């Protein structure tokens, strides 16, 4: 760990130094620190099928057709569906919605469900966060006489399914400008569709006697879906999240306010709250509860219903954590025989399909390799499994999954660079793991070689203050593609180190300036770093590295270090 030679004082312009060190040109600093929609928003018409989708929806609205929104069961799907439902309501249309059951129906549009919706009177179905690869299901829908518009962001194949329109910046035939927005979450694409739809209706004089909807009020949904889906926070996504957090802080959306209360968030939310507090609660509904809870919460106008759903989601999230811990332990036990594999493929019966994505993410973090966790069901040797994968930066897992499907190693599969889902026959597990190992070995090796810890600042302990956190927050929002700053603090002496909770390392450190601070490393009890600090010589000095957070549990807020690494300083 290179801690650098210069120790910064808070009198320095830390914010400017941080942005410049990350490659932001001086003339772009203000734009980066305060991203606006005006600066980053593209013309939605640049996206293929966008105008066709807007015109078809406008026609359905004007003629009074029955519209149904078909969403995925995760946060991106729930926020995308809620965005369109809210928009349609503001336009005077009561649209229905359908969220599939994760365990019974799996990911993506079900042909049977689409046909059933058609039989119930829907003449237009808009799928969000799913559908780009659903050839069979969308063929069934077409044969049933229902139009389907797909709004998605997942990887596409060259041959597209039959639709009335397919809006996806990751279409292989997309324009360069639209393709440059391939990092958008589905909710971001849905927001662009909302702009296009309002523009189309405006041209048809739809708003002569009706107020235009306030599209900016939808940005709280866009921010939540973007962060929770781990979309890269650069360009338009930065503007979405930055502006969306301002909307969220107003607590205008009843369901969001209830979710903030259930999460015990009293202050204005920041981007990490979306990913670690709000998002997991909504996801818990789709993972182990009712798939519709997220959409119901985000669209309700009843404060009591919102409070009840938010509390239910919080309880489900606690249950999810317990289930996840069991699967995590079992999955880690399988790692012993996979040290030489470039991709960790772990599978077993009895694992809850609702938590395998989270466990895959944990395994990825532990091994610094892409990980796929598969829940098998059925008879031995003849079972199928549903799998979820998470990748490391620089390794396109979604493309590899699509390639495996095209090689007939998978029943179904798709995704994007950082995450993927699949269905596989148990008999093909070994061949699938070998295929991924061969295809991705070089990419994984290159990506891991470039993952040396990057430090943004070097500080004396006295510089670790709440004011520093406030200063660094000004360069946010932080997330994938724009990580929270990592600082090195030292040299320090470890005053105390112990294990708290089940497996968290807690450290009290003191610097040569006489200032002390607290550091904590989550789920790190068995790591080499923890063992070194627990059994240190009291005379040794260390540099500690991690991210600075506010600890507001005590009577006075204090800065603490979320510890990621340590190195001897002497």
Q: Residue spans of the language-model regions?
A:
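A generic local secondary-structure boundary/capping motif
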Residues: 138-139, 155, 178-181, 266-267, ...
């Amino acid at each position: 760990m290179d801690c650098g030679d210069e120790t910064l004082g808070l009198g320095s312009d830390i914010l400017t130094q941080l942005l410049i060190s990350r490659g932001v040109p001086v003339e772009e600093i203000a734009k980066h620190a305060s991203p606006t929609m005006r600066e980053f928003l593209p013309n939605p018409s640049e996206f293929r099928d966008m105008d066709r989708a807007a015109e078809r929806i406008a026609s359905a609205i004007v003629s009074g057709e029955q519209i149904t929104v078909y969403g995925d069961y995760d946060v991106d799907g729930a926020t995308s569906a809620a965005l369109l439902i809210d928009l349609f309501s503001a336009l005077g249309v009561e649209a229905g919605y359908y969220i599939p059951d994760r365990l019974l129906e799996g990911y993506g549009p079900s042909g049977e469900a689409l046909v059933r919706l058609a039989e119930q009177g829907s003449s237009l179905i808009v799928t969000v966060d799913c559908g780009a690869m659903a050839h069979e299901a969308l063929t069934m829908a077409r044969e049933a006489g229902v139009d389907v518009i797909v709004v998605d962001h997942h990887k596409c194949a060259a041959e597209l399914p039959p639709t009335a329109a397919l809006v996806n910046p990751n279409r292989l035939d997309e324009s360069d400008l639209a393709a440059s927005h391939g990092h958008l979450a589905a909710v971001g694409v849905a927001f662009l569709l909302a702009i296009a739809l309002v523009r189309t209706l405006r041209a048809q004089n739809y708003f002569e006697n009706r107020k235009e909807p306030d599209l900016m009020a939808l940005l709280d949904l866009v921010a939540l879906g973007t962060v929770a889906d781990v979309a890269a926070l650069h360009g338009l996504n930065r503007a979405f999240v930055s502006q969306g957090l301002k909307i969220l802080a107003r607590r205008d959306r009843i369901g969001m306010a209830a979710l903030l209360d259930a999460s015990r968030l009293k202050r204005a939310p920041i981007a990490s709250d979306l990913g670690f507090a709000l998002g997991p609660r909504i996801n818990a509904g789709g993972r182990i509860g009712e798939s519709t809870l997220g959409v119901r919460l985000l669209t309700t106008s009843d404060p009591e219903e919102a409070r009840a759903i938010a509390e239910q989601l919080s309880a489900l999230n606690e249950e999810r954590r317990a289930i996840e811990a069991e699967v995590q332990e079992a999955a880690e036990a399988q790692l012993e025989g996979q040290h030489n594999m470039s991709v960790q493929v772990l599978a077993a019966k009895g694992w809850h399909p609702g938590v395998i994505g989270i466990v895959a993410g944990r395994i990825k973090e532990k091994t610094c390799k892409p990980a796929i966790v598969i829940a098998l069901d059925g008879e031995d040797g003849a079972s199928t499994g549903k799998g979820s994968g998470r990748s490391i930066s620089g390794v396109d897992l979604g493309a590899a999954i699509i390639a495996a499907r095209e090689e007939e190693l998978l029943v179904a599969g798709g995704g994007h660079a950082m995450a993927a889902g699949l269905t596989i026959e148990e008999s093909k597990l070994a061949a699938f793991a070998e295929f991924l190992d061969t295809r991705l070995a070089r990419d994984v090796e290159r990506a891991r070689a470039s993952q040396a810890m990057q430090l943004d600042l070097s500080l004396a302990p006295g510089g670790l203050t709440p004011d520093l956190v406030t200063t660094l927050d000004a360069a946010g929002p932080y997330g994938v593609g724009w990580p929270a700053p990592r600082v090195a603090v030292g040299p320090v002496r470890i005053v105390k180190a112990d294990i708290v909770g089940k497996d968290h390392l807690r450290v009290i450190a003191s610097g040569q300036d006489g200032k002390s601070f607290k550091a904590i490393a989550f789920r790190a009890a068995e790591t080499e770093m923890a063992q070194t600090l627990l059994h240190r010589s009291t005379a040794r000095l260390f540099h500690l590295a991690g991210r600075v957070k506010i600890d507001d549990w005590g009577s006075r807020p204090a800065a603490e270090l979320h510890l990621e690494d340590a190195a001897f300083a002497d």
